[in-house]
């Protein structure tokens, strides 16, 4: 079973539509069918039903909005998790991966970030990794990222965007 994270809703709905009729078998030998989406638009009641179906092995692909699925969801049954775009901070990435890496998890999960060479996403990834390394060296506890306030997370996002833009301006000036 697979989870796809994305900050934007349209790609999630398009992906779910593409795979709505697909069938397969999970590692328990249970047949799964189709896909589901969790975004901020999905009601709490429907969200719980989608999660229950995924955890029961009834759904093969779960498309999740990074913000909507970052907290309060446990999905340890997933075997693969793809990031169509990058979370804005190491804390956001830790929140997403933390939904899958739980006690009671039955299998390993592979996390795949879809990055194209020479894109803004690649540069953002470099900056995010640098910040995570600095944070880990200074604080030593990546779990502390989960305790970052909304204001601090917003400041981190703004800082990353500023650094990416400045990097592109420097690269353009040097060329």
Model-derived features: positions:
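SF2 helicase motor core recognition
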Residues: 12-16, 47-52, 60-85, 89-108
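Residues at the C-termini of beta-strands that transition into short coil/loop
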Residues: 39-42, 85, 115
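Hydrophobic/aromatic beta-strand patches that form the interior of the parallel beta-sheet core
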Residues: 36, 82, 112-114
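Alpha-helical structural signal in soluble globular domains
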Residues: 18-26, 99
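Residues at the starts of beta-strands that form the adenosine-phosphate
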Residues: 1, 34, 108-110
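A conserved SF2-helicase RecA2
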Residues: 88-175
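Conserved helicase ATPase core of P-loop NTP-dependent helicases/translocases
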Residues: 3-5, 13-14, 20, 29-69
């Amino acid at each position: 079973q697979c989870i796809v994270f994305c900050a934007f809703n349209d790609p999630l709905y398009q992906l779910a539509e593409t795979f709505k009729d697909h069938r397969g078998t999970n590692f328990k030998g249970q047949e799964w069918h189709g896909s589901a989406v969790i975004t901020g638009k999905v009601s709490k009641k429907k969200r719980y039903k989608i999660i229950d179906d995924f955890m029961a092995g009834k759904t093969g692909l779960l498309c999740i909005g990074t913000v909507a699925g970052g907290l309060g969801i446990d999905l340890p049954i997933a075997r693969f998790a793809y990031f169509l775009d990058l979370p804005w901070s190491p804390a956001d990435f830790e929140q997403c991966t933390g939904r899958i890496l739980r006690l009671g998890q039955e299998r390993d999960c592979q996390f795949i970030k879809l990055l194209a060479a020479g894109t803004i996403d690649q540069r953002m990834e470099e900056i995010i990794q640098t910040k995570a390394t600095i944070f880990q060296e200074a604080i030593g506890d990546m779990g502390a990222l989960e305790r970052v306030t909304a204001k601090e997370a917003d400041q981190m996002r703004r800082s990353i965007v500023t650094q990416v833009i400045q990097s592109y301006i420097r690269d353009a000036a040097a060329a």
